[in-house]
Amino acid sequence: MINTLTSLRFIFALMVFGAHCYTIDKFFDTHFFKEGFVGVSFFFVLSGFIIAYNYQKKFSENKITKRAFWVARIARIYPLHWLTLFIAVALGNYVIASGAIDWLKHFLASLTLTNAYIPKADYFFSFNSPSWSLCCEQLFYLCFPFLIPIAKDYKKLLCVFLVSAILIVIGMHFTPETDIKGYWYVNPITRLPDFLAGMLLFQLYDRLKSKNITAYQGSIIEIASIALFLAFYLYAAEIPKVYR
């Protein structure tokens, strides 16, 4: 594992935490904290990088089967998800005004991690609301083995990423802002480009690691990356959400 990723996880986890604190105190209700939602995208990108880092070679060399990969991923997601879901049910006093049938529908959607496919807040944020991100991860894991042949050709993977990202931007442009969260932000299908971006970064990393990059060159790349991120973070409020 790449040790420097641990510090990045910490930083972006804090960003996500800060973005959710606006309900606690108006101190957090500022642009600086609100932009922390980009941390969610970071974790989806990181997922694509880590999964490719750990499994792409194994699939290419037939050292792991699709079934074994999926079983391992399910074992990683579902036990803890179900535990937190049942705790939420027990302690959350979750009630739906329309009655028991709707409660059961929402519960089953959450139980099976299909709630984020339904563009209604009372579904994708029901019970344990952060579980919508697990819906996305579940789709990423399902798709990954089928993306391996494309990933071997960097240009094909880049093309798939660009086309899907452009289509999503176009779709968001014609979607009322009140519907963007349900149709585009939490939807696992429209989050797939984040995962593809992570896979792309791994292909880049895999190519560069064999080259003799000096500490100076590495520092320049690092500083440029941080500067680009900070520029986005500071001026993001000037850019419509559709294009962010």
Regions found by a protein language model. Give the residues of each.
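Aromatic-enriched alpha-helical transmembrane segments of multi-pass intramembrane proteins
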Residues: 6, 23, 105-138, 142-244
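Juxtamembrane transmembrane-helix termini
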Residues: 26-29, 56-60, 95-98, 119, ...
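Juxtamembrane loop-transmembrane helix junctions in multi-pass integral membrane proteins
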Residues: 3, 28-34, 69, 73, ...
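Helix-to-loop transition at the C-terminal end of transmembrane segments
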Residues: 91-102, 174-179
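Transmembrane alpha-helical segments and their boundary/interface "anchor" motifs
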Residues: 37-40, 57-93, 103-110, 135-141, ...
